[in-house]
Every structure is written in structure tokens, then in C-alpha cells.
Design a protein with these regions (language model features):
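Hydrophobic secretory-pathway targeting helix
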Residues: 1-49
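Generic structural signal for short, solvent-exposed loop/turn connectors between secondary structure elements
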Residues: 1, 52-56, 420-424
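Alpha-helical transmembrane segments of integral membrane proteins
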Residues: 4, 10-21, 347-636
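Soluble extramembrane regions of membrane proteins in the secretory/endomembrane system
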Residues: 33-342
Length: 636
């Protein structure tokens, strides 16, 4: 049966915009929240304070805050760090290293001893240590206090012992916000950690954020303890981007909605990946611009040949702060995540199911040459099914995630097919495919425009599927509809050609690379990062590589080959490459932490730059490459 194209197209467009209308309240709420929370603050890690060289008599804190630092991260120093002089007049040694005259004053001679040599702070430091290690004991010898912890030094080398209370006193008195970073608690219990935190927050009201450090979350295995503490005391829990800390996710979940995003790059990553300073500054800016990160920790540059200077570091801070200010980032302290209206989720859930069922029906129509969307009864069943699935998905999140994942895949496939079936009017085809991605992408974004997804506490499982499913769908329908000269049985019944083997290997390799590179910085070289940053500065939003370098240029070349009836056996490669553009564009809408206007601008930039680049490549190929190829062929 032939498809009633005009009726089907009308029903398809009507239901598509119905879904968009239902998703609009969620999109408006998201845009309002993104505008209201456009704020980002720079944070300095106090662990690096001693490494900064400054002119004698200059106040480092004042200079840093004048440059643009808004908060300070206070790490809980480990025994190893105390032994290296991380805190003035404080050190930690094995008990066996003490003089016998001091050691014999303790009830037993083993353990780790924290030596406190500052009389003005010794009492406060002892109060913290007594709560952090209840079984510890302290003795005084003149103006020096020895506090012994009943755990061997090797156990406390990577465990939290004592923060820099002197700096905390100074900054808290000045009202400067503090980010306290408790280290792993191998030497104390969760109850002791909680008591020490209660004492610390009571003594220093400027502590606003908790940011656990180390490979293992503080209070492990009770990973929810720290998050619950933050929530009860009105603190924020830092959600560190790309963190590999064991137990961090459960800590953040326990603190919800008292969560704030934080981006930091440690010294080892900078050295390993050779991240030069301009790239580091741009990376932090992109974290704020593309992922709405509110706290940016700018550490010293380990790649500089000489010792870090305060003036140089302050120059970096000023440059980054100026760029943030110029682009509308305010200096407001972050607040707990808001709650979205329930009615928005209700409408957007139905919208997502309408989109998925609509795209599924359209693909079935294409594959089997039947008409579904022209039948009123079928449209009624589709609408009723969408409502039922939408309501159920509010209580079974798996339905929303599956619906979103498959809707994204079918959307990219449909956009690719729409654009390529308009090969007689190429510009119209490219525009219609892109508009379909925009409308469908907004519907998907509307369903997941809720704080849990915007703050990445819940992850969308359809990102990878939205990249791979369209390739499979296009390949199946092309073989079935004989877009490729051979049918699937014919291909399978003959031996594979060497060109097909090479092509299959290239496609498989490309798919693997695409999956590995679908993150922000994974498997991306320094030179490519420089190129990305240049594009971002020129265009305002960097187009994605799969769109402007691969997919849309492939669409332009395919249009030409189709119109000229050339290379019929190899055009399928270009058709599959075209799906990468639309898959990537849909994929951009699935990054729900990215501001929506940036997603729209990035998609548009990828579309027009890709078509322009494809046109230039086609012109060069036809004007210069084709004559050269003919001449070589005649010589052979």
C-alpha cells in the first residue's frame, strides 16, 4: 500500500508540535532557572598558599581576593602533609621519633604524634583533634603541645588529621566563604568525623561547602553521613566534576538538594596532558559556560619553569574573572537546587511518549510502505498510549529514560531520512532535517528539565544509544528499500569485497572513537583543544566535530553524487556519515546540564558551518580533483 504522504506529513507535524507545546512549560522554567543561576565563583586551594612567592610584607589573602578569588578551599591535612610543613608550626611524626622524656608521659608509647608549636592556636587545635580522635591524648612541654593519636603513622599518611585553623580564623573573621575539604577517615569513626565537623562549623560560620578529597570518601563505608550532615546544617555538598572518588556519588545524593557543582584540575592531570595555562583558563570558563559549574578551583601552574609568583597567579585570576564578568556571570553565592512544578513533569512526560511513538510509527511506515498516521483510529490509539505511558513514567523512571533514549535515536534517523529524501531541493532538505532535530530535541530536553538531571544526580542513559541506533536504522531501511544496489540477502550470499572489509573496519573504528570521544576531554589532544577553543571564541559556541567536519559535509557531497547518479555502490558510506551530524545534534539536547540557548546556538553553528565546509570541499573536488582523477585514470 502506498503511503498517503500529504496526510501523513500533516498528522506528523501536528503531533510533533503538540508534543512541543506540552514540553514548553518545562523549557520556560528551565530557561528562567538558567538565567537566575548564572553565577560562578573562583576558589583558591589553601594547600598551595605557601608555594606562592610574594613580596615581603604583602598580604597574600588580600591580593588574591582583590584579583577575583571569592572563596578559599581549606583541606584537612593528612599526616604526610603535616610532616612536609603544610601548616606553620605543626608537624606529625611517628611516636617512636619523640624524645624519651616526652614519650614516657603518654599512657602507651605507640601511635602518631601531632606536634603543635603555636601557643596562640594550640588550644583550638587540640579541641579539634580531641573530637576527630576521641582516644587521643595531649601533653604539654613548655609552649609545645604533643597530641598522640592511637593509630600508626602509616595508617594516617593519607588520612585527615588537622586543617589550617589559623587561615580559617583570619578568613572567617573577614566573612570570606570557606570550602572545607575533609580527607579520608581511616583513623577515626564516622561519629568522630561528625563531631569534629560540628565543632569546626560552630567555630567558623564562614564554612559554607563540604568537598571531600582523596581516593575514598570521608566516613567510608558510611558514605551518606557527610551528605546528611551537610543537609542538616544548611551546608552545600560539592559535586566535583569527573570525580573518581569512591563513594562520592552517594554523599552528594544524601545532601540533595544542598548540592553545588565544582570543577578542579589536579597537578597530575596538568602534567600528564600538558595543559598549558591559556587552555586551563579556557577549560574553567567552559565549565561555567557549558555546564553551569558554580565553583571553579584555579590551582597554580606546575608547567612554569620558575617558582609560582603571586603576581603571575593573580594575573591569571583577573583574566578569568574578567571573562566571566564580561559574559554575564554574577558573583552570587550558590543556593540549594530548586524544585520544579509537578505539572511541568506531567505534561512533558506525555510529550516525550508522543514523540517516541510518533517517530516509531513513521519509521514503520517507511520500512513497510504502509500508512498509519493518516488513520484517525491509529492517531487516537497513539495519543491514548502516550498519555498512559507518560503517567506511568512519572512513577517508573525507567520508562522516561528508555523513551528518551529511543526517541533520540529515532529522531536522528528520521531527520537524516527527511534531509536525504529532499535531494532534488538540497537546501530545503537540510533545513527540514535540522528543524526536525530542533523541535524533537526540545521535546526531549523538556522532559528532563528537572533538577535531578540538570544537576546530574540522575544520568540519562540514552547518549550512547542516540549515537549508534540511527546508524543501524538507516542501514536497515537502505538495504530493505534498495537504496543500496544490493539487498541484504545478495550481500550475504556473496564473498565480501576487499573494499567492503576496509569500509566495515573504518566504520567500526570510527564508532569506537566516537564513543570514546563523546565526553568533554577524554582522548582529545592538546592541539585539538586549541582548535576547539579558537572556534568557541570566533562563533560563541563551538560546533561539534561530528557535525561540521563529518556529517553535514557528507550530506552536501551525497546530494551531488545522488543528483549525478555517481558511485551508487559507495554512497551508503556517505548516508551513514550524514546520520552522525543529526545524531550529534540530538545528542547535544541530551546534555541537560548545558544551558539551552548554548545548545541551540551550537547546533545552528554546526549546521551552517558544516554545509559551508561541505560546499567548499565539493567545489574543490569537482573543480580540481575530478580532472586530476580522470587524467590519472587515463594514464593507468
Amino acid at each position: 500500500m502506498m503511503i498517503k504522504t500529504r496526510n501523513n506529513a500533516g498528522a506528523f507535524v501536528c503531533f510533533l508540535f503538540l508534543a512541543l507545546a506540552l514540553a514548553t512549560p518545562s523549557l520556560i522554567w528551565r530557561l528562567f532557572q538558567e538565567r537566575a543561576n548564572r553565577s560562578s565563583l573562583l576558589v583558591f586551594d589553601l594547600m598551595e598558599l605557601h608555594a606562592l612567592n610574594a613580596d615581603e610584607g604583602r598580604n597574600k589573602f588580600a591580593a588574591l581576593m582583590e584579583a577575583g578569588i571569592s572563596a578559599f578551599m581549606v583541606p584537612e591535612c593528612t599526616a604526610e602533609e603535616l610532616g612536609k610543613g603544610a601548616i606553620d608550626q605543626v608537624t606529625a611524626v611517628p611516636a617512636a621519633d619523640l624524645p624519651d622524656s616526652v614519650l614516657k608521659r603518654f599512657s602507651y608509647p605507640s601511635g602518631t604524634v601531632v606536634i603543635l608549636r603555636d601557643p596562640a592556636l594550640a588550644e583550638l587545635q587540640q579541641e579539634y583533634l580531641k573530637r576527630r580522635f576521641k582516644n587521643g591524648e595531649g601533653v604539654a612541654d613548655g609552649q609545645t603541645v604533643y597530641f598522640k593519636i592511637p593509630h600508626p603513622y602509616v595508617q594516617l599518611e593519607k588520612a585527615g588529621v588537622l586543617p589550617d585553623l589559623r587561615s580559617m580564623q583570619y578568613l572567617s573573621a573577614a566573612g570570606v566563604p570557606l570550602v572545607f575539604a575533609p580527607s579520608p577517615s581511616m583513623g577515626s569513626s564516622g561519629e568522630e568525623l561528625e563531631e569534629s565537623l560540628t565543632f569546626l562549623c560552630g567555630s567558623f560560620p564562614s564554612v559554607k561547602v563540604l568537598c571531600p578529597t582523596g581516593e575514598i570518601a570521608a566516613a567510608y563505608p558510611d558514605t551518606e553521613l557527610l551528605g546528611s550532615f551537610a543537609k542538616r546544617h544548611g551546608l552545600l555538598m560539592a559535586q566535583v566534576e569527573f570525580s573518581r572518588q569512591y563513594g562520592a556519588a552517594r554523599q552528594v545524593a544524601a545532601a540533595w538538594p544542598n548540592v553545588v557543582s565544582l570543577h578542579a584540575v589536579d597537578r597530575e592531570e596538568v602534567l600528564k596532558r600538558n595543559i598549558i595555562r591559556p587552555l586551563m583558563l579556557n577549560r574553567l570558563y567552559r565549565a561555567a559556560e557549558e555546564r553551569e559549574v558554580h565553583l571553579l578551583v584555579l590551582r597554580l601552574d606546575p608547567l612554569r619553569a620558575v617558582a609560582p609568583q603571586l603576581a603571575e597567579y593573580c594575573g591569571d585570576v583577573k583574566a578569568l574573572r574578567a571573562r566571566l564578568d564580561e559574559n554575564g556571570f554574577k558573583r552570587l553565592w550558590p543556593v540549594p537546587a530548586p524544585s520544579s512544578p509537578w505539572i511541568n513533569s506531567f505534561f512533558s512526560a506525555i510529550a516525550l511518549q508522543i514523540l517516541f511513538l510518533l517517530l516509531l510509527a513513521r519509521y514503520v511506515e517507511r520500512y513497510f510502505d504502509i500508512s498509519l498516521l493518516s488513520r484517525r483510529r491509529f492517531l487516537g490509539v497513539l495519543a491514548a498510549t502516550a498519555v498512559v505511558l507518560g503517567v506511568f513514567s512519572l512513577y517508573a523512571g525507567i520508562l522516561s529514560r528508555l523513551g528518551g533514549a529511543f526517541a533520540a535515536g529515532f529522531l536522528a534517523a528520521e531527520a537524516s531520512l527527511v534531509s536525504m529524501e529532499r535531494w532534488k531541493v538540497p537546501l530545503r532538505g537540510a533545513a527540514e532535517g535540522f528543524l526536525l532535530v530542533l523541535v524533537g530535541g526540545l521535546v526531549i530536553a523538556g522532559r528532563f528539565s528537572v533538577p535531578l538531571y540538570m544537576y546530574r544526580l540522575s544520568t540519562f542513559s540514552g547518549v550512547k544509544l542516540s549515537l549508534l541506533l540511527p546508524l543501524v536504522l538507516i542501514l536497515l531501511i537502505d538495504v530493505h528499500k534498495r537504496e543500496h544496489p544490493e539487498s541484504l540477502p545478495e550481500i550475504l550470499s556473496r564473498p565480501p569485497l576487499w573494499g567492503e572489509i576496509a569500509l566495515a573496519g573504518a566504520l567500526l573504528l570510527a564508532a569506537v572513537v566516537m564513543l570514546l570521544r563523546s565526553g568533554n576531554y577524554g582522548f582529545v589532544g592538546t592541539s585539538e583543544i586549541v582548535f576547539r577553543d579558537w572556534l568557541e571564541k570566533i562563533l560563541g559556541a563551538r560546533p561539534r566535530t561530528k557535525e561540521f567536519l563529518v556529517g553535514y559535509p557528507a550530506l552536501v557531497v551525497w546530494y551531488y553524487l545522488k543528483r549525478q547518479e555517481m558511485w551508487s555502490h559507495w554512497r551508503e558510506v556517505l548516508r551513514l556519515a550524514v546520520t552522525l551530524a543529526f545524531s550529534s545534534a540530538v545528542n547535544s539536547f541530551c546534555h541537560f546540564h548545558t544551558p539551552l540557548p548554548l545548545t541551540l546556538l551550537r547546533g545552528f553553528n554546526g549546521w551552517w558551518t558544516g554545509l559551508l565546509l561541505g560546499s567548499l570541499l565539493l567545489f574543490v573536488g569537482v573543480r580540481f580533483g575530478r580532472p586530476v582523477f580522470r587524467r590519472l585514470r587515463s594514464l593507468l
